[in-house]
Amino acid sequence: MNESSIDGRLPALPARHRMIWRWHFYAGLFCIPFIIWLSVTGAIYLFKPQFEAWQDHAYEHLPMTGAAAAPSQQVAAALAAAPGTRLNAYQIPRTPDSAAQIIVGQGESVYRAYVNPQSLEVLQVINDDHRPMQVVHDLHGRFLIGDPGSILTELAASWGIVMIVSGLYLWWPRDVRGLGGVLYPRLSRRGRPFWRDLHGVVGFWVSAFALFLIVSGLPWTHFWGSNFRALRQIGQAEAVKQDWATGRSAEMAERMAMNRPADVGDEHSQHRHGMTMAAPSDAGVVDTAALDRIVATLAPMSLAQPVKVYPPSQKSAQWYAWSLPPDRTQRVKLTFDAATGAVRTRQEFSDKRLIDRIVGVGVSAHEGQLFGWFNQMLGLLTTAGLIALSLSGFMAWFKRRPQGLLGAPPVLLGRGVPAALWGPALLLGLLLPMLGLSMIAVLIVERLLLRRIPGVRDFLGLQPA
């Protein structure tokens, strides 16, 4: 790739190539730890359905000697085991001898109670945030630090796009003498040439899948996702509803809304209409008799599991049920008349807006759930490829780094950013605001600070060649 910083050939490289290589180097330097982290946690999360089926196996095939109690009674048992909580959702037992999973909450906390549907024995109550796959989910997208972690993930993902696109440019064969080192690594090579071959070849094969994973994950991030939602809201009379939360704060706000009854906390709207209404003392109590009617309506529908029934809250003023299989394209949402249990509305995946369908398909594929085990294997190979890409890039750098220096491609004397790079840089900066802001910050810090400190300037390769 003509990239040695010590063999005297660098001055012959075009300014554009030098600049792209430099940005590729720094993008990789920043991204490698995050790529390895996201790849490992993402690979684990691919197998969430299988893991949680194993995790819950103790609550399957329960000994049953008679008919199950009413769902309302099961909910009452769960609430008694978790005092002070409110019903968030009732998950219909997967089989007649499976435990009912009842989700209850208080404030920002959510708990899952496993209840024997016949004896009403509460088998276990666990904080949902402590379930292993929820921990992996939070490690993957937020580093367990909430919105700051989501922003950091988005920043790494944005620079990951720079790394991949610039890497493809550097990989592009300009003097083809065979496919070795282009489409497959030359295994007979040793040392740095071998690692460079491996880095370029793996990068080529994994690039399209890696770009897909990055782009499909952006709607879930705090900064990009929130702005994406704001753009969708333009020109819409009603608030845009999404099936996903953009960051930890949005998720916590949603939990708080679910833990507040629908008819409490709106005093201002009552005063605006000239009414003074005292909230009933039992306003926070859910009419669980409606749950019994709704579950009876759902019984013959054979919706894809799991199926959860949600009571009215400040999130939604009506009872609704949601079929939530891992493949989002198979999900169904229904609303109900609480008095009769009759279905009011039914929304299939095909009924959603186009952008919601695109995001839904993308996330299902991202999580390895769109087309079965092959999707999981493809995701696993992609994450393994990204780890190999990161390690081979590190080794290629480690083998060539000059003693006492970082080994970054030095800048060219009197040469700024080539004109051909301004367009792509501006486009990426607009589409990925965190990338644009960080690029500006890097350029300012480099030019105004780092180049003025001799030791730092030499170490980073900022001394013009």
Residue ranges of predicted features:
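Conserved histidines in hydrophobic membrane contexts and catalytic metal-binding motifs
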Residues: 1-465
